Amino acid sequence: MFGKLNHLAITSDHYTLLGMFYRAMFGLKASGDTAREIGAISVGDGYVGMTLIPRRGGRKAGLDHFGIEVEDLDKVRSKLAKKYPDIEIVKRPGNRPFASYSAHDPAGNYFDLSQPGHENRAEVYAKGEWKQETTFSHFAIRAREAERLADFYTDLFELEARNLPSEEGGYHLTDGRMTMAIVPWKISSFNGAGIEQPGMDHIGFRVPDIKAFEANRDRIAKTNIQLAPKPIPFDAEGAARLALLQKCPHGTVQLADPDGTLIDVAQDHS
């Protein structure tokens, strides 16, 4: 596969808390580089890295963007210039542990681009791959023109489309290990709940034993209330939002991190 879906990013006022949450809840590993973690913390599963970014003034909190590692960045630049001339690709500051460049899709969702061997790569992105039982499974984007975005990502990064039951008009693209779900954004989807802008929707994990995961989740919440998942269905609006999340075919248990980022979890049956 030409493109690897192996980077996620969350912006937060509590990035150090989230670092502990994802390590405790899902067994993700951090680099342990304190000098770099003053600026941001990256955690990973041996394939996907997720950078937790301190929120600056004017920047929104929450699930922020994703990234794609490519074999040949020049090939991507050439294809963008030829087929999508209105889409920009820009060089990023050298202190990013993953991103060498960033671009955007036709809907304006921005994503980072990286290539093995680039000098800026650091932390979990420079450690090489390792194996662990709990891993990322997918992330989801809500978009007005889901089909157009699916065509864009399959064309540019040679991702494989999967035929899965989903929300009507949804698409699921995979690099063989991680899946990008592109689901339609409709204002009516949020009936009974707070309306959210199009953009990134949630992240997902696969675990070896869903019952053991739930027991560990409850143990963590009792041990340290600050690491407890934020409740989703605490009222009628929350229940409506949970019902929307549950339409995703990749998960069976849903929760939110302490900041409210939605998470979908399923047992690995491979």
List each language-model region with its residue ranges.
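Vicinal oxygen chelate
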Residues: 4-13, 41-44, 55-132, 164, 172, 218-270, ...
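Core segments of cupin and vicinal oxygen chelate
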Residues: 1-49, 95, 99, 140-187, ...
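Short, charged/polar, Gly/Pro-enriched secondary-structure boundary elements
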Residues: 47-51, 60, 108-111, 177-181, ...
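Short beta-strand/turn micro-motifs at beta-sheet edges
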Residues: 53-55, 124-128, 188-193
